[in-house]
Protein backbone atom coordinates (compact mmCIF):
# COMPACT_ATOMS: atom_id res chain seq x y z
CA UNK A 1 0.00 0.00 0.00
CA UNK A 2 1.63 3.27 -1.10
CA UNK A 3 2.00 6.37 1.06
CA UNK A 4 0.31 8.36 -1.72
CA UNK A 5 -2.77 6.17 -1.47
CA UNK A 6 -2.86 6.44 2.30
CA UNK A 7 -2.75 10.22 2.15
CA UNK A 8 -5.98 10.25 0.16
CA UNK A 9 -7.88 9.38 3.33
CA UNK A 10 -10.17 12.04 4.69
CA UNK A 11 -9.75 12.88 8.35
CA UNK A 12 -11.81 14.48 11.10
CA UNK A 13 -9.71 15.76 13.98
CA UNK A 14 -10.70 16.98 17.42
CA UNK A 15 -7.98 17.45 20.02
CA UNK A 16 -6.54 14.01 20.68
CA UNK A 17 -9.09 12.10 18.61
CA UNK A 18 -9.22 11.44 14.91
CA UNK A 19 -11.09 9.19 12.54
CA UNK A 20 -9.88 8.39 9.04
CA UNK A 21 -12.55 7.78 6.43
CA UNK A 22 -11.66 5.34 3.66
CA UNK A 23 -13.75 5.31 0.47
CA UNK A 24 -13.86 3.13 -2.62
CA UNK A 25 -14.88 4.15 -6.13
CA UNK A 26 -16.57 0.85 -6.99
CA UNK A 27 -17.79 -2.37 -5.42
CA UNK A 28 -14.32 -3.91 -5.79
CA UNK A 29 -12.60 -0.82 -4.42
CA UNK A 30 -15.04 -0.78 -1.50
CA UNK A 31 -13.99 -4.35 -0.70
CA UNK A 32 -10.37 -3.21 -0.67
CA UNK A 33 -11.29 -0.19 1.45
CA UNK A 34 -12.97 -2.45 3.99
CA UNK A 35 -9.79 -4.52 4.19
CA UNK A 36 -7.81 -1.31 4.82
CA UNK A 37 -10.29 -0.20 7.47
CA UNK A 38 -9.65 -3.42 9.37
CA UNK A 39 -5.94 -2.64 9.77
CA UNK A 40 -6.32 0.27 12.24
CA UNK A 41 -3.02 0.64 14.11
CA UNK A 42 -0.89 -0.68 11.25
CA UNK A 43 -1.29 2.57 9.33
CA UNK A 44 -2.36 5.07 11.98
CA UNK A 45 1.11 5.19 13.49
CA UNK A 46 2.45 6.54 10.22
CA UNK A 47 0.16 9.54 10.47
CA UNK A 48 0.71 10.46 14.11
CA UNK A 49 3.59 12.87 13.55
CA UNK A 50 2.00 14.51 10.54
CA UNK A 51 -1.33 14.99 12.28
CA UNK A 52 0.34 16.19 15.47
CA UNK A 53 -2.19 14.46 17.68
CA UNK A 54 -1.80 11.91 20.43
CA UNK A 55 -3.09 8.49 19.46
CA UNK A 56 -5.80 8.09 22.08
CA UNK A 57 -8.72 7.18 19.87
CA UNK A 58 -7.69 6.28 16.34
CA UNK A 59 -9.99 4.37 14.01
CA UNK A 60 -10.34 3.69 10.32
CA UNK A 61 -13.88 3.52 9.01
CA UNK A 62 -15.39 2.89 5.59
CA UNK A 63 -17.99 4.96 3.79
CA UNK A 64 -19.42 2.51 1.26
CA UNK A 65 -19.02 4.16 -2.16
CA UNK A 66 -21.93 3.75 -4.56
CA UNK A 67 -21.31 5.30 -7.99
CA UNK A 68 -24.43 5.53 -10.15
CA UNK A 69 -22.77 4.59 -13.44
CA UNK A 70 -21.41 1.37 -11.96
CA UNK A 71 -24.96 0.04 -11.59
CA UNK A 72 -25.41 0.35 -15.37
CA UNK A 73 -21.95 -0.92 -16.28
CA UNK A 74 -22.31 -4.00 -14.08
CA UNK A 75 -24.83 -5.45 -16.57
CA UNK A 76 -27.08 -6.53 -13.70
CA UNK A 77 -28.06 -3.56 -11.49
CA UNK A 78 -29.98 -5.70 -8.99
CA UNK A 79 -27.07 -8.12 -8.55
CA UNK A 80 -24.78 -5.14 -8.09
CA UNK A 81 -27.12 -3.71 -5.47
CA UNK A 82 -27.16 -7.01 -3.59
CA UNK A 83 -23.35 -7.11 -3.70
CA UNK A 84 -23.16 -3.66 -2.14
CA UNK A 85 -25.74 -4.62 0.47
CA UNK A 86 -23.85 -7.78 1.42
CA UNK A 87 -20.59 -5.83 1.73
CA UNK A 88 -22.28 -3.18 3.86
CA UNK A 89 -23.71 -5.78 6.23
CA UNK A 90 -20.32 -7.48 6.52
CA UNK A 91 -18.69 -4.16 7.36
CA UNK A 92 -21.39 -3.27 9.89
CA UNK A 93 -20.80 -6.55 11.71
CA UNK A 94 -17.10 -5.72 11.87
CA UNK A 95 -17.85 -2.23 13.17
CA UNK A 96 -16.23 -0.60 10.15
CA UNK A 97 -18.90 0.54 7.69
CA UNK A 98 -20.56 3.65 9.10
CA UNK A 99 -22.35 5.25 6.11
CA UNK A 100 -23.61 4.86 2.56
CA UNK A 101 -21.79 7.17 0.20
CA UNK A 102 -20.38 9.11 -1.31
CA UNK A 103 -23.41 9.38 -3.55
CA UNK A 104 -25.58 12.10 -5.01
CA UNK A 105 -25.83 14.26 -8.13
CA UNK A 106 -23.08 16.14 -9.95
CA UNK A 107 -24.16 18.13 -12.99
CA UNK A 108 -20.75 19.79 -13.37
CA UNK A 109 -19.24 16.50 -14.55
CA UNK A 110 -21.84 15.06 -16.91
CA UNK A 111 -19.10 13.52 -19.08
CA UNK A 112 -18.77 10.89 -16.34
CA UNK A 113 -22.45 10.06 -16.07
CA UNK A 114 -25.61 11.56 -17.64
CA UNK A 115 -28.17 13.15 -15.29
CA UNK A 116 -30.93 10.60 -15.89
CA UNK A 117 -28.65 7.74 -14.86
CA UNK A 118 -27.47 9.71 -11.85
CA UNK A 119 -31.03 10.39 -10.70
CA UNK A 120 -32.19 6.81 -11.25
CA UNK A 121 -29.49 5.24 -9.11
CA UNK A 122 -29.28 8.02 -6.54
CA UNK A 123 -32.87 7.05 -5.75
CA UNK A 124 -31.79 3.40 -5.55
CA UNK A 125 -28.99 4.21 -3.13
CA UNK A 126 -31.51 5.30 -0.52
CA UNK A 127 -32.67 1.69 -0.47
CA UNK A 128 -29.18 0.73 0.70
CA UNK A 129 -29.41 3.23 3.53
CA UNK A 130 -32.89 1.99 4.45
CA UNK A 131 -31.85 -1.68 4.43
CA UNK A 132 -28.76 -1.03 6.56
CA UNK A 133 -30.15 1.79 8.75
CA UNK A 134 -26.98 3.74 7.97
CA UNK A 135 -26.62 7.50 7.48
CA UNK A 136 -25.59 8.91 4.11
CA UNK A 137 -22.53 10.79 2.88
CA UNK A 138 -23.83 12.94 0.03
CA UNK A 139 -22.54 15.00 -2.88
CA UNK A 140 -24.44 17.82 -4.62
CA UNK A 141 -22.93 19.94 -7.36
CA UNK A 142 -25.00 22.26 -9.58
CA UNK A 143 -27.99 19.97 -9.02
CA UNK A 144 -29.83 21.38 -6.02
CA UNK A 145 -33.35 21.20 -7.45
CA UNK A 146 -33.22 17.54 -8.50
CA UNK A 147 -31.16 16.58 -5.44
CA UNK A 148 -33.65 18.09 -3.00
CA UNK A 149 -36.64 16.59 -4.83
CA UNK A 150 -35.13 13.12 -4.49
CA UNK A 151 -34.19 13.83 -0.89
CA UNK A 152 -37.75 14.84 -0.08
CA UNK A 153 -39.16 11.63 -1.53
CA UNK A 154 -36.73 9.53 0.49
CA UNK A 155 -36.36 11.53 3.69
CA UNK A 156 -37.68 8.68 5.84
CA UNK A 157 -35.33 6.08 4.35
CA UNK A 158 -32.15 7.20 6.10
CA UNK A 159 -31.23 8.20 9.62
CA UNK A 160 -29.31 11.34 8.73
CA UNK A 161 -26.44 12.55 6.63
CA UNK A 162 -24.13 15.28 5.44
CA UNK A 163 -23.96 16.97 2.05
CA UNK A 164 -20.21 17.41 1.87
CA UNK A 165 -17.97 19.82 -0.03
CA UNK A 166 -20.85 22.28 -0.27
CA UNK A 167 -20.41 25.01 -2.88
CA UNK A 168 -24.02 26.04 -3.45
CA UNK A 169 -25.93 29.27 -3.02
CA UNK A 170 -27.68 30.60 0.06
CA UNK A 171 -30.92 29.25 -1.42
CA UNK A 172 -29.36 25.81 -1.86
CA UNK A 173 -28.07 25.96 1.72
CA UNK A 174 -31.50 26.77 3.06
CA UNK A 175 -33.10 23.94 1.07
CA UNK A 176 -30.69 21.47 2.64
CA UNK A 177 -31.23 22.87 6.11
CA UNK A 178 -34.98 22.37 5.69
CA UNK A 179 -34.33 18.63 6.01
CA UNK A 180 -34.20 18.02 9.74
CA UNK A 181 -31.63 15.22 9.51
CA UNK A 182 -29.21 16.91 7.10
CA UNK A 183 -25.87 18.55 7.90
CA UNK A 184 -23.69 20.61 5.56
CA UNK A 185 -20.01 19.76 5.10
CA UNK A 186 -17.45 22.49 4.46
CA UNK A 187 -13.94 22.19 3.00
CA UNK A 188 -11.56 24.31 0.95
CA UNK A 189 -13.86 24.23 -2.09
CA UNK A 190 -16.57 25.78 0.08
CA UNK A 191 -14.33 28.74 0.96
CA UNK A 192 -12.91 30.02 -2.35
CA UNK A 193 -14.77 33.28 -2.90
CA UNK A 194 -16.18 36.02 -0.69
CA UNK A 195 -19.63 34.89 -1.82
CA UNK A 196 -18.85 31.38 -0.54
CA UNK A 197 -17.89 32.80 2.86
CA UNK A 198 -21.19 34.66 3.02
CA UNK A 199 -23.05 31.39 2.43
CA UNK A 200 -20.98 29.53 5.04
CA UNK A 201 -21.70 32.26 7.61
CA UNK A 202 -25.35 31.31 7.33
CA UNK A 203 -24.83 27.63 8.21
CA UNK A 204 -25.70 27.17 11.89
CA UNK A 205 -22.80 25.70 13.85
CA UNK A 206 -25.04 22.90 15.09
CA UNK A 207 -25.75 21.82 11.47
CA UNK A 208 -22.18 21.93 10.16
CA UNK A 209 -19.28 19.51 9.69
CA UNK A 210 -15.82 20.17 8.28
CA UNK A 211 -13.47 18.01 6.21
CA UNK A 212 -10.46 18.14 3.92
CA UNK A 213 -11.67 15.91 1.06
CA UNK A 214 -7.98 15.21 0.57
CA UNK A 215 -6.12 15.07 -1.71
CA UNK A 216 -8.45 17.63 -3.29
CA UNK A 217 -9.99 20.94 -2.19
CA UNK A 218 -6.99 22.51 -0.46
CA UNK A 219 -7.17 26.09 0.79
CA UNK A 220 -4.98 28.13 -1.54
CA UNK A 221 -3.35 31.54 -1.22
CA UNK A 222 -5.98 32.95 -3.60
CA UNK A 223 -8.89 31.90 -1.36
CA UNK A 224 -10.98 34.64 0.20
CA UNK A 225 -10.40 33.43 3.75
CA UNK A 226 -6.66 32.79 3.53
CA UNK A 227 -5.90 35.51 6.10
CA UNK A 228 -7.72 33.46 8.74
CA UNK A 229 -5.27 30.55 8.33
CA UNK A 230 -2.88 30.30 11.28
CA UNK A 231 -1.65 26.69 11.12
CA UNK A 232 1.06 25.98 8.57
CA UNK A 233 3.23 22.94 7.85
CA UNK A 234 6.47 22.62 5.89
CA UNK A 235 5.98 21.14 2.43
CA UNK A 236 8.18 19.80 -0.35
CA UNK A 237 7.59 18.76 -3.93
CA UNK A 238 6.75 15.09 -4.32
CA UNK A 239 10.05 14.54 -6.13
CA UNK A 240 11.80 15.50 -2.88
CA UNK A 241 9.52 13.49 -0.62
CA UNK A 242 10.20 13.87 3.09
CA UNK A 243 8.01 12.05 5.62
CA UNK A 244 8.33 15.04 7.97
CA UNK A 245 6.74 17.36 5.39
CA UNK A 246 3.54 17.63 3.44
CA UNK A 247 3.58 17.08 -0.31
CA UNK A 248 3.38 20.48 -1.95
CA UNK A 249 0.14 21.07 -3.82
CA UNK A 250 -1.66 18.13 -2.22
CA UNK A 251 -4.34 18.57 0.41
CA UNK A 252 -3.60 16.29 3.35
CA UNK A 253 -5.70 15.26 6.38
CA UNK A 254 -3.97 17.46 8.94
CA UNK A 255 -5.01 20.54 6.94
CA UNK A 256 -8.54 20.18 8.27
CA UNK A 257 -7.23 22.56 10.94
CA UNK A 258 -7.05 25.28 8.28
CA UNK A 259 -10.69 24.68 7.35
CA UNK A 260 -11.59 25.05 11.02
CA UNK A 261 -9.67 28.33 11.23
CA UNK A 262 -11.20 29.86 8.10
CA UNK A 263 -14.76 28.92 9.06
CA UNK A 264 -14.25 30.23 12.59
CA UNK A 265 -12.76 33.43 11.21
CA UNK A 266 -15.51 34.14 8.72
CA UNK A 267 -18.18 33.45 11.35
CA UNK A 268 -16.45 35.61 13.96
CA UNK A 269 -15.95 32.68 16.36
CA UNK A 270 -13.17 33.31 18.90
CA UNK A 271 -13.39 30.11 20.99
CA UNK A 272 -12.01 27.73 18.38
CA UNK A 273 -11.74 24.82 20.83
CA UNK A 274 -15.42 25.03 21.68
CA UNK A 275 -16.23 25.34 17.98
CA UNK A 276 -14.14 22.25 17.26
CA UNK A 277 -15.90 20.33 20.04
CA UNK A 278 -19.29 21.27 18.61
CA UNK A 279 -18.32 20.07 15.13
CA UNK A 280 -17.02 16.83 16.60
CA UNK A 281 -20.32 16.33 18.41
CA UNK A 282 -22.20 16.93 15.15
CA UNK A 283 -20.09 14.28 13.45
CA UNK A 284 -20.68 11.80 16.25
CA UNK A 285 -24.41 12.42 16.16
CA UNK A 286 -24.60 11.27 12.55
CA UNK A 287 -21.80 8.74 12.09
CA UNK A 288 -20.65 7.69 15.57
CA UNK A 289 -23.66 7.86 17.92
CA UNK A 290 -21.89 5.51 20.33
CA UNK A 291 -19.44 8.37 21.02
CA UNK A 292 -22.08 11.02 21.71
CA UNK A 293 -21.73 10.93 25.51
CA UNK A 294 -17.99 11.53 25.32
CA UNK A 295 -18.50 14.31 22.78
CA UNK A 296 -21.13 15.98 24.97
CA UNK A 297 -18.82 15.78 27.97
CA UNK A 298 -16.02 17.43 25.99
CA UNK A 299 -18.38 20.16 24.81
CA UNK A 300 -19.60 20.80 28.36
CA UNK A 301 -16.03 20.91 29.64
CA UNK A 302 -15.15 23.47 26.99
CA UNK A 303 -18.06 25.68 27.99
CA UNK A 304 -17.12 25.48 31.66
CA UNK A 305 -13.52 26.43 30.92
CA UNK A 306 -14.64 29.46 28.91
CA UNK A 307 -16.73 30.81 31.77
Task: For every predicted segment, state its role.
Residues 1-307:
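Mid-domain alpha/beta scaffold segments of enzyme catalytic cores
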Amino acid sequence: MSFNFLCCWKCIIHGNRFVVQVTGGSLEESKEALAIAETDGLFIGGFSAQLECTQLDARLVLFLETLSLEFEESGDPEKHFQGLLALAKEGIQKGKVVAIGECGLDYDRLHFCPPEVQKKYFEKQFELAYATKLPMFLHMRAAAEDFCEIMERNINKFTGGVTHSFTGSAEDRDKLLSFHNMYIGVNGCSLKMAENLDVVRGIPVERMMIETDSPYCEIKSTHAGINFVKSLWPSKKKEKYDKECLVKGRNEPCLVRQVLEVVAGCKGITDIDLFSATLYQNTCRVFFPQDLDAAADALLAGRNESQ
